[in-house]
UniProtKB/Swiss-Prot annotation:
Subcellular locations according to the entry: Cytoplasm
Protein name (record): ATP-dependent 6-phosphofructokinase isozyme 1
Organism: Escherichia coli (strain K12)
A GO term for molecular function: fructose-6-phosphate binding
GO terms classed as biological process: canonical glycolysis; fructose 1,6-bisphosphate metabolic process; fructose 6-phosphate metabolic process; glucose catabolic process; glycolytic process; protein homotetramerization
Length: 320
């Protein structure tokens, strides 16, 4: 029977992580469980840096961006001997189960601990929206709001100078954030990793827009696809229109979470405790069709496919 749990945040931070921690902590305490917060993700777990959390530990946290427990990259956690030390630290503290909030790398760590016999529940916390088994991740909608605000501001100056703007959006190898921002921001063109990209085809589309009388344009592109400064120079050379690149960078990860992310994080945090009390371990939580769901974390990582939002792309193209 579970009496004490641990909670950590891992990988890149996302708005709503604090709300998720709060959801875990307060739900666990309501059910009579003790909660230990683990600093700096798997690194802190390995180094045995933990703190007892109570209701007041998470007061005034639901509106704060980032993660008050901290996060860190710790690739050494792939080493089974490192994980064995981590499990020993958990057992030494009397911790019976672990809630991990983070992205796919964090899920991998939780999966490895599960394979070694320690029960874990994964909550999807990343702005990239690239986690299998869930429609949306904690932080996605806040990042979307940040990106759209930036695009709106760029549109003001681009229209004033009849300029083309290339905006690089986070997402790693998932185009969801770029696609959503392109639709909500009214971008004229969108480039995502799920679809083959040609600079020449993009330029031809831009030229076609200019021929129709378009005075300015915004191109939204997912990071890692190309050097956006070089792309901007290429567009300017081929079209004769002044073109500038803007890399939004880590500003997309910050800020107070929007209400949807606060609600999603709170629901998922509480649901994680429900699962643990029901005897589940080695699960990852998601939301599908607005219903909370859970999947075997090993099956989710190794076998589940994440569908591309092709209908979003079709919509964006119709609105060019």
């Amino acid at each position: 029977m579970i009496k004490k749990i641990g909670v950590l945040t891992s990988g890149g931070d996302a708005p709503g992580m604090n709300a998720a921690i709060r959801g875990v902590v307060r739900s666990a305490l309501t059910e009579g469980l003790e909660v230990m917060g683990i600093y700096d993700g798997y690194l802190g777990l390995y180094e045995d840096r933990m703190v007892q959390l109570d209701r007041y530990s998470v007061s005034d946290m639901i509106n704060r961006g980032g993660t008050f427990l901290g996060s860190a990259r710790f690739p050494e956690f792939r080493d089974e001997n490192i994980r064995a030390v981590a499990i020993e630290n958990l057992k030494k503290r009397g911790i019976d189960a672990l809630v991990v909030i983070g992205g796919d790398g964090s899920y991998m760590g939780a999966m490895r601990l599960t394979e070694m016999g320690f029960p874990c529940i994964g909550l999807p916390g990343t702005i990239d929206n690239d986690i299998k088994g869930t429609d949306y991740t904690i932080g996605f909608f806040t990042a979307l709001s940040t990106v759209v605000e930036a695009i709106d501001r760029l549109r003001d100056t681009s229209s004033s100078h009849q300029r083309i703007s290339v905006v690089e959006v986070m997402g790693r190898y998932c185009g969801d954030l770029t696609l959503a921002a392109a639709i909500a921001g009214g971008c004229e063109f969108v480039v995502v990793p799920e679809v083959e990209f040609s600079r020449e085809d993009l330029v031809n589309e831009i030229k076609a827009g200019i021929a129709k009388g378009k005075k300015h344009a915004i191109v939204a592109i997912t990071e890692h696809m190309c050097d956006v400064d070089e792309l901007a120079h290429f567009i300017e050379k081929e079209t004769g229109r002044e073109t500038r690149a803007t890399v939004l960078g880590h500003i997309q990860r910050g800020g107070s979470p929007v209400p949807y992310d606060r609600i999603l994080a709170s629901r998922m945090g509480a649901y994680a405790i429900d699962l643990l009390l029901a005897g589940y371990g080695g699960r990852c939580v998601g939301i599908q069709n607005e219903q909370l769901v859970h999947h075997d974390i090993i099956d989710a990582i190794e076998n589940m496919k994440r569908p591309f939002k092709g209908d979003w792309l079709d919509c964006a193209k119709k609105l060019y």
